[in-house]
Amino acid sequence: MLRTVSNAFTTRSHVGSTASSNSWSTIVPALARFGSIGVLRAAVELINDGEKPDASPLVHLLRVSGNYGYVSLCRQLHGYVTKHGFVSNTRLSNSLMRFYKTSDSLEDAHKVFDEMPDPDVISWNSLVSGYVQSGRFQEGICLFLELHRSDVFPNEFSFTAALAACARLHLSPLGACIHSKLVKLGLEKGNVVVGNCLIDMYGKCGFMDDAVLVFQHMEEKDTVSWNAIVASCSRNGKLELGLWFFHQMPNPDTVTYNELIDAFVKSGDFNNAFQVLSDMPNPNSSSWNTILTGYVNSEKSGEATEFFTKMHSSGVRFDEYSLSIVLAAVAALAVVPWGSLIHACAHKLGLDSRVVVASALIDMYSKCGMLKHAELMFWTMPRKNLIVWNEMISGYARNGDSIEAIKLFNQLKQERFLKPDRFTFLNLLAVCSHCEVPMEVMLGYFEMMINEYRIKPSVEHCCSLIRAMGQRGEVWQAKQVIQEFGFGYDGVAWRALLGACSARKDLKAAKTVAAKMIELGDADKDEYLYIVMSNLYAYHERWREVGQIRKIMRESGVLKEVGSSWIDSRTKCSSY
């Protein structure tokens, strides 16, 4: 049964022992104590020679096989467990679930769970925590509620996993109910882990008073407790309170300092962020990256490149995230020499093949109009995930190359382990819209997205369709799309249609759309609406209306955004 795996072990190990000189009585202690490949090989040979193990050896076999990443062997052991009726052994089934959970195969773990006649609290906790740790918070919560209704009594680990999911989903009512249950069961008092989870949950749900109350009532606090309360203050804009806790903290660590830096950056206070960074005993790359990210997110790309230079002069060792962040800044500025320099730096550090860096390089080169460089990055990558495929399709879309975008999309559909997602179709529909691909082709992709891939259209998907219809003079059909997909009250959809009317210089249709936007209340501070209508009236030489619109803009305080350009020198980027 396991002969091929056994042969694989033979090539990896030169252990002299053979199956004939071993028995399960000697193998099991060796597996439990050492868990080496040689011992594992001997165990596999025993099975192949007809020595059937009971549940205890199988538990150790699964653990050791999982530790070495022998997925195929673990799956074969699962088959052996099922075939020989060991499914009812709770401990063994829990070991199988643990393996599948650590192998990111939650569906398989859930199948094992469903086959168990009497799952215990460890079984439930393994699955609940698995869903939460993999970001599937709703499924984790549903399973926790199912546990609560079952005959199995949840323990502190059940509750902390559920609290983590509540925090991410902002389910404060459920979180408060769990808190009450913990108090009733006496699991809150004296339990640092439970207290930390409660602080995190209340902080992420925006209930700072409750977070502080939990913190103050904790009999014992560790570093995680202090970091949780500082992070909660920072997350909710309570910077002064966060600083107060920071100064009370016995031994702030890197996480504490990074939380403060992040809080100052998000509030736009870069000076204090720098101060915290300079006060840090041992800042790591994450500390610097937080400020770098802040600049990029604040659309201060020039400052981001300057700060990146400062990082280099300060001797900071760049990681893949440092490079991907600064590449986003370079892409926004379209400064090719900087991009080439960072690409060379990434190559020197051996990081250019990392997915996060490679996708950022593809994005940067495509935004700079250097599609050949982007293509070279894409095709030379040893492994490509969906993000990279989407980035390349987006690059073609951005540069108006509908033929290559569609060709790459068709290649993606042939990939065995990948399938297009909402972002793939967003890029595909965008390139179809801008390149005047026949409407029936575009509608075909739209229907494929809904029917074949079960993706619900977002307003962004519909906007591409709306623009294409509007640019072809099919304003009535575009309005139908807006209403049919439930975006009649979404200003973004009407904005897209207004842009299409503007491209066709269709003043009559534009006036109808503008009236709808005003009705929705999206016009008060929307410079786009006023500028489009002003330009359309000017095109049709309706100067009186142009004057009226500009007067309304002045009275409403709507200002046209001032444009700027960038010049890059050898050391920095300057704007004018």
From Swiss-Prot:
Q: Which GO terms describe its biological process?
A: RNA modification
Give the family per the record: Belongs to the PPR family. PCMP-E subfamily.
Q: Know the name of this protein?
A: Putative pentatricopeptide repeat-containing protein At5g47460
Q: Which NCBIfam families match?
A: PPR
Annotated organism of origin: Arabidopsis thaliana (Mouse-ear cress)
Question: Start-end of the PPR repeats?
Answer: 20-53, 54-88, 89-119, 120-154, 155-189, 191-225, 226-252, 253-287, 288-318, 319-353, 354-384, 385-419, 421-452, 458-488
Which residues lie within the region annotated Type E motif? 493-570
Q: Which InterPro entries match?
A: E_motif (IPR046848), Pentatricopeptide_rpt (IPR002885), PPR_At4g14850-like_plant (IPR046960), TPR-like_helical_dom_sf (IPR011990)
Q: Which PROSITE patterns match?
A: PPR (PS51375)
Q: Name one GO molecular function term.
A: RNA binding
Please provide the record's keywords in A-Z order. Repeat
Pfam families for this protein: E_motif, PPR, PPR_2
What is the gene called?
A: PCMP-E103
